[in-house]
């Protein structure tokens, strides 16, 4: 049976994606849903937020994804040191501009990280360092855009906290998937070369499996220790 490449709908396996049907990449949406599901299984609270990373007008990038990849490595290294468990999905797009831009969706341990503005500040810092331009330029030109404006210019919220123990947990999760689903759309106007990578995701599958293996290991160690203690007291 051939593997699905794209589909046209406004939902995916019961998860609402948009108001009207549009074309999505099956693999991209699958990854987005799995990211949110995996993180909400791993943490009781998950902070989800979207940002766009852009180049300043007139900047001569080399056309590769090197700037983006290096900046994301620095961001994730920074967040990992603070125990935020940073995971992300990202999409490269390029239309009429000389340079690409990147849509990024983050999912972090919400028990450790709760501030979206602080998340943006960290992204701005590492994006400015990678492009070797002043931080003030990144901030003034909104080169790390918080995705808080609707197409008509009105304000819209960016990001949310998914609280697994909340009565609204299911709704919070669905809204997060819906927001990130923008990264899974098919854009006919994208001029990115077919040989250039357009979709990115952190190793959340690998990290999750490692975390669960360690949890089982320590649970077994604790159970064995408890059993040994009980035997010794008889």
Where are these regions (language model features)?
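Catalytic "initiation/cleavage/transfer" segments centered on a nucleophilic residue
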Residues: 1-43, 110, 115-234
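Charged, low-complexity, helix/coiled-coil-prone segments
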Residues: 4-22, 60-76, 104-106
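Signature for HUH/AEP ssDNA processing cores
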Residues: 33-94
């Amino acid at each position: 049976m051939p593997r699905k490449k794209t589909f046209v709908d406004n939902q995916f396996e019961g998860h609402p994606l948009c108001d009207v049907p549009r074309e999505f990449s099956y693999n991209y949406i699958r990854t987005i849903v799995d990211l949110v599901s995996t993180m909400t299984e791993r943490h009781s609270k998950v902070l989800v937020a979207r940002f766009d990373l852009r180049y300043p007008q007139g900047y001569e990038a080399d056309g590769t994804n090197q700037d983006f990849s290096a900046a994301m490595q620095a961001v994730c290294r920074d967040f990992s040191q603070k125990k935020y468990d940073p995971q992300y999905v990202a999409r490269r797009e390029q239309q009429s501009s000389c340079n690409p831009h990147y849509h990024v969706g983050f999912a972090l341990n919400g028990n450790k990280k709760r501030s979206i503005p602080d998340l943006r500040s960290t992204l701005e810092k590492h994006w400015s360092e990678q492009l070797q331009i002043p931080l003030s330029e990144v901030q003034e030109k909104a080169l790390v855009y918080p995705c808080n404006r609707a197409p008509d210019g009105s304000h819209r919220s960016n990001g949310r906290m998914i609280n697994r123990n909340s009565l609204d947990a299911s709704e919070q999760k669905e809204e997060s998937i819906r927001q990130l689903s923008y990264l899974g759309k098919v854009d006919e106007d994208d001029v990115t070369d077919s040989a250039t990578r357009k979709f990115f995701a952190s190793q959340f599958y690998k990290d999750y499996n490692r975390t669960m293996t360690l949890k089982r290991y320590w649970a077994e160690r604790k159970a064995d220790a408890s059993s040994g203690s009980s035997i010794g007291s008889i």
